[in-house]
Amino acid sequence: SEMCIRDRNHTVDSVQLNEACSSGCGSFIETFAKSLNYTVVDFAKAALFAKNPTDLGTRCTVFMNSNVKQAQKEGATVADISAGLAYSVIKNALFKVIKINDASDLGKHVVVQGGTFYNDAVLRSFEKIAGCEAVRPDIAGIMGAFGAALVAREYYQSCLLYTSDAADD
């Protein structure tokens, strides 16, 4: 699942959790790259030099395979398909999953997270669509788990405090 947290003046302005799946995007790109005998890194690099990124729509990656096969039949280059996949993953996440109307609504200060953002083509596609430079932390792929661990620790500590207070009574 995906979550979008909007910050305004150092406070959370809104939180949106998707109602649809957006998982498996990175896995799909990696599997497709391997099917063409590319590493995911080389596949992403190819996308960065695409002349005509293939329009693969904004469908879930589960249903995108047929669009990719059609693009291959029509003679699209590996670079154009790779770029098209990166754009499609971002468009799906922003417009179908998070359901924003305009990418500029994201603002100019964006931090991305998730393992799929380790893919430079996906990151660059996001930046082009959003019209801003995004910050990709070194721990982008584990930020969700890290955040969950922090929440769990806070909950655990509050339970210990509550238990300690109850024992003192």
PLM feature segments, named:
Residues 1, 16-24, 84-87, 111-116, ...:
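Active-site nucleophile and cofactor-binding loops and adjacent substrate-binding regions
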Residues 2-7, 162-167:
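Conserved small/polar residues in nucleotide/adenosyl-binding loops
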Residues 26-31, 138-164:
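Glycine-rich phosphate-binding/hydrolytic loop that grips phosphoryl groups
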Residues 39-67:
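Internal, active-site/partner-interface "lid" segment
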Residues 66-95:
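Adenine-nucleotide phosphate-binding core of ATP-dependent small-molecule kinases
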Residues 88, 101-129, 140-144:
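Glycine-rich phosphate-binding loops at beta-strand->alpha-helix junctions
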